[in-house]
Amino acid sequence: MQSTIKPVEYDRPVAAGTVCGVGQAWAKVPDAPSAEERAALKARIKALLAREKAVLVAHYYVDAELQELADETGGCVADSLEMARFGRDHDAQTLVVAGVRFMGETAKILSPNKRILMPDLDATCSLDLGCPVGEFSAFCDAHPDRTVVVYANTSAAVKARADWMVTSSIGLEIVADLHARGEKIIWAPDRHLGSYIQKKTGADMLLWQGSCLVHDEFKGIELDLLRAEYPDAKVLVHPESPENVVAQADVVGSTTQLIDAAVKFDAKRFIVATDLGILHKMQLAAPGKTFIAAPTAGNSATCKSCAHCPWMAMNGLANLADVLERGHNEIFVDPAIGERARLPIDRMLEFAAAHKKRVQASGDLQRDQSLFANVGAA
């Protein structure tokens, strides 16, 4: 059973002063600096992080140079929730989030007394854009008998309307547990991840019809052709991808689980169906192996993302240096919303602890080897 709610079009024109659509995001992507400029910017950022007593956390999907900076300065490169948890547990009172807005909000929810900065506050997420809190709340109100489960890729306001928040690495287990208890579910916002979980668990789920711009563009027919070209390659797929892509996967998993799979598999070649930003960490974790991007266009079709999130690409060295220099672009979450939004997050963390499952990994592959035991073939 699926929702009939029409999703918000995330490539629509957006008024000035609000989050930006796809075209506006690509227009705001910083130009690549020269080698000389890059070196100067990195040195400046390191000095500013020290001056501000700040720590940099970066998502796997941002550009490699930002991931390198986070690693080099004692920060963190990870999934969205681990970014927030790292910031919460770190001594620094200023956390700089290189990612998209919901990640900054989640960091603020877990660290309400810390200063959370972002290189560009317009950097958003198509899943967040496609699930406006007003429409979503009305949909939930129309189905009061259902437990509301939302994905991490949502605004603080949507999280505050939920009973549970989940990540891609634990969503399956939580929904299976709810289903075993006879609970009916509203799932938001990603329809592909929701459908994957629904098929695996048999749960009664109403699916909000959102999608990730990047993962929604992966093409099943073209992937099949690419697999024929590289028959020795293992296929790694994020579950936000369409069903005909997920069906061809050797492993379906979260970003960290896919990195772990690249390390643990004996294969020397991998086809990867997630954002290209992850390839930097995969190449570091599994040197000597080859990673091929899954196709996002075919049969004369074009792609809007071409396997790289335009909002993630808005994070650059220059605007990172600027936000540290000026102290602007601070994330604020209404305290009442933040307090309510923390409840579904804490519920997930308590479930993970009770089931001895790590919800997200830290990027430390030695520590996180057990994660891969929870990932099965599609």
Swiss-Prot record:
Signal peptide: none annotated. It comes from the Bacteria. Its cofactor is [4Fe-4S] cluster. Binds 1 [4Fe-4S] cluster per subunit. Keywords: 4Fe-4S, Cytoplasm, Iron, Iron-sulfur, Metal-binding, Pyridine nucleotide biosynthesis, Transferase. One of its GO terms (cellular component) is cytosol. Iminosuccinate binds at H59, S80, Y151, A152, N153, S168, H238, P239, E240, T255. [4Fe-4S] cluster binds at C125, C212, C309. Its EC number is 2.5.1.72. GO terms for molecular function: 4 iron, 4 sulfur cluster binding; metal ion binding; quinolinate synthetase A activity. Pathway: Cofactor biosynthesis; NAD(+) biosynthesis; quinolinate from iminoaspartate: step 1/1. Its main location: cytoplasm. It catalyses: iminosuccinate + dihydroxyacetone phosphate = quinolinate + phosphate + 2 H2O + H(+). It is found in: Cytoplasm. GO terms for biological process: 'de novo' NAD biosynthetic process from L-aspartate. Catalyzes the condensation of iminoaspartate with dihydroxyacetone phosphate to form quinolinate. Belongs to the quinolinate synthase family. Type 1 subfamily. This is Quinolinate synthase. It comes from Burkholderia orbicola (strain MC0-3).
